[in-house]
Amino acid sequence: MTSDPINNHKYLFPTSSGSNESLLILLNRTSEIICKWFSDAEKLGPLPIDINFECSAPEEYGKSTDVLFSEIQSLINSSFNPVHPGSLAHLDPPPLIISILGDLIAAGLNNNLLAHELSPSISLLEESICKWFAKKLGFSDLAGGVAASGGTLSNLNALVAARNHAGLATDPKAVYLISEDAHSSFVKCTSIMGLEKNNLIKVKTDKNGCLDMIELNKNIDKCTKEGKRIFAIVATLGTTIRGAIDPIERISKICKERKIWLHIDGSIGGIFSITNLPINRNINVNLANSITINPQKILGITKTSSILIVSNIEILINTFSTGLPYVSTENNVLN
């Protein structure tokens, strides 16, 4: 054992033989600091106790273990503490203990979800979890999904799949519709997809903050007259400000009649659809072609975590799967 496990260059990486004692020392010390921060939350409050945190650039030869942990403590003291019972201002719940362990294991394994051979167990776990969510949401056996680092990316994946499925990947007149209270991430998605601002059509809401069906029909008719082809309509299951739920069943009926992809942004409220809570009544999310679920909100899964569920996984595969000549493709799952 060394006196300073950080600066002993023999132990920069976990060893493939031996006890990994240096790693254990650092893990234990880190655990003690974070657990004390949790334990002190109620008496210290959710807001930072130190607002003078200073960022420091990496040094060529590193820092001692004591200096490093002093800076870690400063970082923690300058952080928002979601464990405090009064930290209810945003959708940032305390992390589940088991989720903290999951992050630790994922960091230690450091497997690459690019291909099955690089992450054999985790790739299968991802597929299994998405299938589980799909079944709980009422989708058929054809459904599946993919995990992503946040709701914005899940929404983006859904929109790209919808546009590709409609055969409008290169159509400059391809548009999609959202409510005026939909999440701001859709503006980002529009830009990333190479579309102009006017390719995103915002529909007015009613007095309750829900997408107005009369206004929706007006916008659809206008798009038809102007020769604009709609590749998706987005319904929100829990808007950011008011928690409003768009009329999913009525929107679904229009989408089926006009052969338009229905995507549900359930980043906030979607997680309730796997429960028996009253919010789940009369909300058939399985009517959609796709839905975004964010376990990091409300469910207590560590950031960032999001899942996109698609009613037919083959559409997602056809949209995003590519050949990887430098890795094995045998028994691959969607990554």
Predicted regions and their residues:
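PLP-dependent aspartate aminotransferase-fold enzymes
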Residues: 2-9, 92-106, 110-229
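N-terminal entrance/gating region of PLP-dependent enzymes' catalytic architecture
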Residues: 2-142
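Active-site-proximal loop/turn and secondary-structure-junction residues that shape catalytic pockets
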Residues: 182, 239, 268-270, 297
